[in-house]
């Protein structure tokens, strides 16, 4: 018995300590709850109610504040196009309090920036800044810092990366690739003509050495959508010249010829950047040549050497090219992102990150 007494005393002492701690914890929680109940403001109460609405939603609700360029998309397409389930897209701003995500297109933000700065935001809601234009073609707006939680753009270091297109493995559903019939050597379709653009200066020199079939608003030869793809497909080479040069900025000017069975001749970021997203032997980079004249000689050589030309399509044995769905894909990929990433943060330096 003597040996057991110290053990019993320790047990009793431990129980007393636990009871005291429990009582103290209850007091703290009860006091905090009572204080919150009496001092909570109307704005805080509305915010908590909004958070409750969000928690009650079974699907992830994505509110597209305004469809980019007014092009409304079918809102049930996340599962159909991208196999992303559990997402509900809406453009009804009355569902703001229920939305897990609110998407804002940069080009439209200037219209209601002052309104955004004043808007009450539900506790669990995330705002996504969406942009597919380069910094040169995006208005730099004040007060974007500390406003958004996530970024969705063509840049590969965005939170949600949405390129203009993708190279994907060819499936059984894809038809065996055959190079389309070609009756033109080099083509270019362009609307935005600016003598200060590098692409215009390069084109002006290149056309001195090789015939280029030109189309688009800049040449007063507009094409319908059907004519557009048919024209690209009929050319051996297509000038995929970007209007501005930034890392990761390769647009539909690159992916449309890849999808159409044409070899893109690219002017944009360095070759190494392109090779991070498309096969190295699927395109020609203007930087591969010392001058436009040297490039022209290479194109004319390829015109006379079918076997060498066909090597640009070796990758099509295993892969194919797909376009993205502007606006819709941003919304669906953002939904997928927050379903897999629950952490909450605020983007502190969006302006510096994007415009430098």
Task: Name each model-derived stretch.
Residues 2-129, 139-356:
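Pol beta-like nucleotidyltransferase catalytic core
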Residues 133-136:
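A short, histidine- and acid-enriched strand-loop-helix "catalytic/donor-clamping" loop
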């Amino acid at each position: 018995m003597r040996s057991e007494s110290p053990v019993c005393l320790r047990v009793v002492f431990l129980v007393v300590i636990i009871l005291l701690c429990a009582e103290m914890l209850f007091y703290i929680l009860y006091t905090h709850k009572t204080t919150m109940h009496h001092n909570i403001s109307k704005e805080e109460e509305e915010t908590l109610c909004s958070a409750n609405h969000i928690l009650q939603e079974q699907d992830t609700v994505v509110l597209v504040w305004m469809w980019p360029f007014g092009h409304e998309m079918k809102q049930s397409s996340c599962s159909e196009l991208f196999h992303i389930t559990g997402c509900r897209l809406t453009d009804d701003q009355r569902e703001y309090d229920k939305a897990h995500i609110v998407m804002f297109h940069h080009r439209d933000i200037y219209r209601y920036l002052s309104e955004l700065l004043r808007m009450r935001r539900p506790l669990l809601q995330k705002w996504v800044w969406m942009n597919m234009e380069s910094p040169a073609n995006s208005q730099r707006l004040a007060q974007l810092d500390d406003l958004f939680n996530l970024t969705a753009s063509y840049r590969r270091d965005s939170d949600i990366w949405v390129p203009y297109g993708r190279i994907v493995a060819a499936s059984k559903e894809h038809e065996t690739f055959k190079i389309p019939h070609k009756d033109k050597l080099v083509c270019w379709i362009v609307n935005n003509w600016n003598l200060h653009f590098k692409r215009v200066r390069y084109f002006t020199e290149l056309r001195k050495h090789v015939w280029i079939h030109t189309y688009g608003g800049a040449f007063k030869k507009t094409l319908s959508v059907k004519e557009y793809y048919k024209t690209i497909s009929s050319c051996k080479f297509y000038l995929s010249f970007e209007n501005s040069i930034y890392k990761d900025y390769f647009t539909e000017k690159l992916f449309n010829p890849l999808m159409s069975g044409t070899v893109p001749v690219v002017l944009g970021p360095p070759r190494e950047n392109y090779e991070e997203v498309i096969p190295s032997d699927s395109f020609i980079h203007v930087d591969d040549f010392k001058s436009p004249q040297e490039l022209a000689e290479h194109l004319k050589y390829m015109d006379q050497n079918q076997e060498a030309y066909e090597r640009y399509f070796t990758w099509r044995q295993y892969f194919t090219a797909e376009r993205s769905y502007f606006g819709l894909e941003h919304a669906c990929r953002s939904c997928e992102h927050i379903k897999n990433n629950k952490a909450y943060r605020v983007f502190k330096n969006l302006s510096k990150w994007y415009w430098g």
